[in-house]
Amino acid sequence: MAISKGNASKEAQEFKRYIGVCPVFVKAVNPNKAEHEELFNTTLEEAPIYVQDKEDAEGNSYKNVRISVVMQPDVEKIGFEMPLVTMPLFVTNQKQHGAKSGKYQVVDKYGRFAWATEAEISAKEIPTYSNGKRADISNDYRIAFVGEEDLTAFIKTFLCIPSITKWDNDERCMVPNNDVKPEDCECRLEVESFEKLFKGDFSEIKEILGFQPNNKVKVCLGVRTDPNSGRLFQSVYTKKFMSNASTNFNSLDKMLQADIAYASENGKVLNTEYSAELVHEYSIIPTSFHTSTEDTNMPFDTPSEDVSDPFA
């Protein structure tokens, strides 16, 4: 008999995943190998890679930078223990360009974004949209990098940087915010800062997110299902960040619902599930199968009771 005795069976190791709005501290940014091992109590075979050379559909090479923000959930606030969560933000040295509109995304020194034509950019004009309204942006803008808007939004929300303008319900438009000083509203990384990122120098972004070490920000956690293996991974929604004081998540919910509607209308499948509820442990709702007592439109005849078993 040539059969191995095998090994003792083991239970599958389960890792909890969480979904919903969660207050977090920033624990680290792009940790090196030693820092990563200490943070996550693990051992890495190689150092993390944060800058990669990529190639687009036209064969043009570009730099893709991953900014990994390691976040510590505020367990005192949420009332239960949670592990560290890593949020990846990606930026590239490509210009943010709208393929259909032909416009470029631009950003001013206050971290406001808009879309402008080449003619508007050349003339340094405030972009005007099809409805006749002018964009809420100053003319000191520059063309934005791909991924810059998400990164800027996180920095601005985490550091509690006020907006230079505010919404006026009577005028139905944005008006100057006279309650703040303009210099306190500045929030834009300059081109030189991005050039450092593309070279793998993250000292400046680490310094910026370290300005307010005790600050918290609320992020939306989700769970991504790998379509091939079915494994579940913790995810973070990077289109919307909320101040720690936020208690109304309606705008987040509208964005999540809009994403679902867009995917449905365009035949896309969303592999990540998010929730605008308060953070809680994620659980899969099992499919309920009901046995019908009636024989209704069955595609095949049901086997008769006297059919013999061919393998008996």
Regions found by a protein language model. Give the residues of each.
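Short beta-rich binding modules
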Residues: 1-312
